[in-house]
Every structure is written in structure tokens, then in C-alpha cells.
Amino acid sequence: LAEQLKIIPLGGLNEIGKNMTVYEYGGEIIVVDCGMAFPGDDMYGIDCVIPDVSYLVKHKNRIRGMFITHGHEDHIGAVPYILKKVNIPIYCTRLTAGLIRLKLEEHGLLKSTKIVTVESGMTVKAGKFSVEFIHVNHSIADSVAFAIHTGLGTVVHTGDFKIDSTPIDGEVIDLARFGELGKQGVLALLADSTNVERPGYTMSERTVGRTFNRLFQGCKQRIIVTTFASNVHRIQQIMDAAAECGRKVAVTGRSMENVTKVAMDLGYMKPPKNTVVDINKIKSMPLEKQVIVTTGSQGEEMSALYRMAFSQHKQIEVGPGDRVIISASAIPGNENTVSRVINELFRKGVEVIYDRADMLHVSGHACQEELKIIHALTKPKYFIPVHGEQRMLQLHKDLALQMGMDRKNIVICDNGDAVEIGARSMKCVPGYAPAGEVFVDGYGVGDVGAVVLRDRKHLAEDGMVVVVLSISAQNGDLLAEPEIITRGFIYVKDSEELLQDLRNLTMSTAEAYRGKRGRDLNELKGAIRSAVSNYLFKATKRSPMVLPVITKL
């Protein structure tokens, strides 16, 4: 068999989140990223969604390692769940490792997992793969792209990136290395499509710092800033701005406290001296000396900002003496929850600053011109747009065509497809690996499927009606009047007539059935279910879930 490299995305295509890509070469496998996605509005009770890794479980003896580009949830969120199924070593940078360790500790997996920290610029040998770590800019520190070297050629996997010429840590993206790889020849490029709809360049993270300085200077109120917990450089800039005008900073919200602790311990966040204080200490200080950094930029229900807005926060009570700055844009789908929190803050007399035009947030993803730079530097033979919804992948393809790429060398695939690259050819094999969604609900992983969700949706929309029936084991006679129990369907006290009709209907259905010989209880249940459902739909235009319960005595 001729040499072949297979690239199999298991998540991250035609969606935002749960990024995961499998590379297979010479009978060996490496996995890049292992993310989760937020549940949709119709996924009742689901905590998060992770990729289906049955393909990896099937081939677990061939996996040589998992490589992580950076520490965002859509790239590391599924790590603990996947490690329970396949225990493989993890290779990543220091901050990413610190954030993964937090997760593994929660799941009791820290002892059994091998995490190897790698500096950008270094190369890791994993079986027949050599994976080179290349520094990039993004909205979390210590992000990398990978150059995956194989016998067939080199694949550049950008991960999430932007080109920031004035990053907070002074570490500019290693464009020179992308250019060198391009000179040596890049077999394929997989690049971030998130911001391909936006022309121009993404603004530098530093512009947000200037906004903070402007909003902090001369402000007489307490300042509360919410942003993504993982945005270490944003939090650093808040601390710097606070110190400059003589304010103290306290952090609240579990994920924010965890991330800032890890980032400070590892030296990625360097707060000015004596600036950071405990949340319980800051309360006794004058309001104009306080800055509070909090979670909740997406309006999440149990987040610290949400609890402040709805008067449920243990330490902080907000009111007219407060200025809240929302330093994040709403992730698509979260707009309603964010405006709910903003409205509640307004109701309490809080000044809320959340305007996009105010340079309160910059994206961590490359816009069109930056993507063109990466394409021009790497000059790939083949191109696979990743990390985006269908329109983004299509637009990224158009951008590559503008850059002079050959149409037949660009492939837009779906999760579970395999892109097979040979010495002279590339083809996409649809549906090569299973790649559905696995739902996490509490401790259960994958035990809630489409059927359970359908039931939850049904219950949420129309409620349920339970029909309880006792019949004689001897002759099938009814022993008592049927009992009707409803939940989430009607208010019983106002609907006695309807319930009596249901009892009568159930009795007549059971009577009709009694005459039948070889009585099958399931048949009776089915008959009652359809009679009651049909009647209720006619009477109320609703279709609750009907559960007949029959006991033989």
C-alpha cells in the first residue's frame, strides 16, 4: 500500500466548539485538541457536549499522544471525559498544562495521566510523527500552532490564532517560522476560520488596556469588570489600570479564581505589588478604591455577575455606586442571557458599559488580512478550512482561491470525514469515522441520547399524564376507578370535568379489552395511551406524554 496520511476531524467543523482532529500515518495516530461545546437551547438539562471518540477507543493501542494548542474550553473541555476512555499522554505548553491539571484534579485523574510540558519552538517525537510547537497570539497566553512532520510532508495546524504586533507579553507570533516552513514546502494547511467574515486585521489586545485606563481614571464609583476567565492578558491589563489609579483588585467567580491562581503561580500574570486582595477584605475599603474582576460575561446563570445582578452574591451587593464594564462580546446564542443580566443591573441603578464601539473587547481570531498572511507564508499544496460553521468554511475556501490556490486542492469536510493524502493525490472519504455528539449530564456521559432529549422536550412542552389502573388477575375486572395524575399539564382543581372524562374513557377502554382472550397488558397499555392522547388533543390541542401504569392484583 502506498504511503498515506489521513486527517479525520471529529469535531469543530460546521459548528463552534468541541474541536478535535485525528492524524493517522504509518499505522499510528496522534490527536490534536479535545474540546467541548455549549449545549443548544433545546438540550434540556445537558451540561456540555463532547465529541464522539468511539473511533479512538477502537484504535487506542495505535495512539501516540494528544497535542493541545491552547487552554480554552472548546479545546480542552473534553479532556477528562476522553481520558477515562483512552489513557494517552498529553503534550502542551505550561499554562495549558496548568489549566488541564485543574480539570483532571476535579475528576480524580491527575495521578493516572502523563502531562508533558513543551516550550514553543520545541519538537516532540511521537511515533512516526514529529510535532513542532510554534508560538501564536490568541486571547489566552501560551497558545501554539503545530507543524506536524511526517514522511509524506508537513501539515500546519494553526489552532486559534491572530497576528498581534503589540501583545501584552511581548511575544509576537512566530511568522518567520511559518515562512521557513513554506519555503521547505507545506503539504497541507488547516486554519482557523472563525473571523473569516471580517475584513482587515484584528485589533491588538493592548487597545483594550487603553480603554480600561480611560474608564478607570477619575471614576468615583466602584468598578466591576467581567471578561472571559481564561483571558489572562485582559485580567493583567485590568490589574495594571487599577494600580495606576490607586485601586485594589479582587477576583470572584470559581473559574476566574482558578485561572488567575494558575496564571500567577506560573508567572503568566504579574499583578503590580500589593494590588490584589481577597474579596472579603476589599468590602471594607472605600468604593472608589475597589475593582472587582468577575465571571459572567455571557450571562451564565450561576456566574458571579449573574448572582450580583439578582442579589444572590454572598459578598458583593451592587447598586447606584457601581460601574460595571462588560469586556467581552456575546457568543452567538447567548445574547438573550446577557441582556437579561444587563437589564437587571440597570434596574438596580448600576452604570453598565457594554458598547462594542467602545473598544471594550477585541477578538482572539484572525481576520481576512491575517489569514491571507498565513496562506502566503505557508503556500500549502492542500487546504482544509477548520474551526467554523459552514458559511465560514466556504468563505475561507473563497479566500484561498483569491490567493491563487487550485480549487481541486481545497476540501471542505464534515466531522467524521477522512481526508486521505497520498504522494500525488488527495481525496475526502465522507463518514469515515463516527462523529456525533455525546451529551454530558451530571456524572452521566453519553447515557442521555437523542431519545431522552426528545422525551425531555416533550415533557417541557406539554407535561405528562399518568393513568393508574388496578385490574383483577383472575378475570381482568377493574378493581377501582382509575387514578389520573398530571404534572405540568393542567391545574387539577380547575379541570375536574376533564379528569372525570379521562377516568370514564379509561374504564370503557379497559372494559372493551376485557372481552379479549389471551389478554396482553402491553396491548391494553397501548390502547389506553392512544385513546387518552387522542381525547386530550381534541379537548385541549395539547399532547402531553401519557404513561399508563397497570397493576394486576
Label the predicted regions.
Residues 2-67, 72-284, 303-317, 336-340:
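His/Asp/Glu-rich metal-coordinating catalytic cores
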Residues 13, 37-45, 62-63, 354-357, ...:
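A glycine- and charged-residue-rich anion-binding loop/surface
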Residues 15, 140, 286, 459-461, ...:
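Solvent-exposed loop and beta-edge segments used for protein-protein assembly and interaction
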Residues 89, 384, 547-548:
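Short glycine-rich phosphate-binding loop at a beta-alpha junction
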Residues 104, 400, 536:
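Conserved hydrophobic residues forming the short capping helix/wall of the S-adenosyl-L-methionine
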Residues 119, 414-416, 542-546:
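Short Gly/Ser/Thr- and Asp/Glu-enriched loop/turn motifs at secondary-structure junctions
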Residues 198-327, 331-356, 360-517, 525, ...:
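Hard-cation-handling environments
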Residues 517-553:
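C-terminal tails and terminal domains of large nucleic-acid-associated
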